[in-house]
Each structure stands twice: as structure tokens, then as C-alpha cells.
Amino acid sequence: MPKMKTHRGAKKRIKVTGTGKFVIKHSGKSHILTKKDRKRKNHLKKDAVVTETYKRHMQGLLPYGEGR
């Protein structure tokens, strides 16, 4: 059986923690920021942990746990 391929876009955007969690950046922080309040922009700065619902999908995109 051939090797599974890593999704190259996912490799650039998703990091895998030591415990196996997937960490991504929030979207909506690059432009049109004047209408967003300070609290919202500060929350968008922080990394987001992928929920259990999407964890299986992320494992398919990164079969070898790349992105560390």
C-alpha cells in the first residue's frame, strides 16, 4: 500500500502539541479591524485548540503528526 500524503496546506497552518492536540490560528485578524472591539481582537490573537469533533479530520490531513 502506498504511503499516505500529508496535506501541504494543513502542514503550514496546523501545529501538533506534545500531547497530540492540534493548534490553529484564529481567522479574522488581518484587515477590517476598525469595527471589531479590543476584546474581540485580543481573543483572536490567541491560538485555538481544535475540538474533538475535528480531531479525526486533522489526523487524516497530517497522518505522520507533522507540523511540530
Swiss-Prot record:
| Organism ancestry | Bacteria, Fusobacteriati, Fusobacteriota, Fusobacteriia, Fusobacteriales
User: Which InterPro entries does its entry note?
Assistant: Ribosomal_bL35, Ribosomal_bL35-like, Ribosomal_bL35_CS, Ribosomal_bL35_sf
Q: List the disulfide bonds.
A: none
Q: What does the similarity note say?
A: Belongs to the bacterial ribosomal protein bL35 family.
**Sorted alphabetically, which keywords does the UniProt record give?**
Ribonucleoprotein, Ribosomal protein
Which PANTHER family does this one have?
54S RIBOSOMAL PROTEIN BL35M (PTHR33343), LARGE RIBOSOMAL SUBUNIT PROTEIN BL35M (PTHR33343:SF1)
Among its keywords, does the record have rRNA-binding?
A: no
Q: Which residues form a coiled coil?
A: none
Task: Tell me the superkingdom of the source.
Answer: Bacteria
BP GO annotations = translation
What GO molecular function terms would the record report? Answer: structural constituent of ribosome
Q: Which GO terms describe its cellular component?
A: cytosolic large ribosomal subunit
**TM region positions:** none
Q: What is this protein called?
A: Large ribosomal subunit protein bL35
